[in-house]
């Protein structure tokens, strides 16, 4: 009986945790072209220094696909190789934003992204060396336009 209660409690906790990390309230199908604007770097050489597109070379994102379907589907394609091949831990999509986050198996690397529908701004953050005292961050900012005029 104790084992049954323990397993039931664990499943309830996992379900609650999953519900907190997934909140899809809007179906959408976005096809975005995003122009790189600036990056903020935190690493041994730079302490949260900002660089514009004129100061550092970064690629634009062509054909960023965001598909969401209630209650729990959120797919993002072409943002990064990491996002293309991993399951998302955080999936939020509503009338204002979409937010995603994922970690590698060792939980020492993560990527997250926030897209604001109203402004078209996309922020893509990469964090490395999470388990170490000196984490490194690469935070890129993009200006996006939706190619699907009807969404």
Explain the meaning of each model-derived region.
Residues 126-151:
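Edge beta-strand at a domain terminus
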Residues 60, 85-86, 106-112, 123, ...:
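Short, surface-exposed coil-to-beta transition loops
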Residues 69-115:
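Contiguous, well-ordered beta-strand patches that form the walls/edges
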Residues 10-11, 32, 142:
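Secreted/extracellular small peptides and ectodomain modules produced from precursors
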């Amino acid at each position: 009986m104790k084992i049954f209660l323990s397993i039931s409690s664990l499943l309830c906790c996992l379900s609650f945790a999953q519900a907190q990390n997934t909140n899809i309230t809007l179906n959408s199908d976005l096809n975005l072209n995003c122009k790189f604007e600036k990056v903020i770097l935190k690493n041994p050489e730079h302490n949260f220094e900002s660089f514009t597109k004129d100061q550092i070379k970064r690629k634009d994102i062509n054909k960023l696909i965001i598909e969401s379907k209630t209650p729990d589907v959120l797919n993002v394609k072409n943002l990064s190789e990491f996002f293309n091949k991993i399951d998302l831990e955080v999936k939020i999509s509503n009338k204002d934003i979409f937010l995603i986050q994922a970690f590698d198996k060792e939980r020492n690397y993560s990527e997250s992204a926030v897209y604001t529908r109203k402004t078209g701004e996309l922020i893509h953050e990469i964090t490395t060396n999470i388990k170490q005292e000196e984490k490194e961050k690469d935070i890129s900012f993009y200006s996006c336009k939706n190619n699907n005029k009807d969404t």
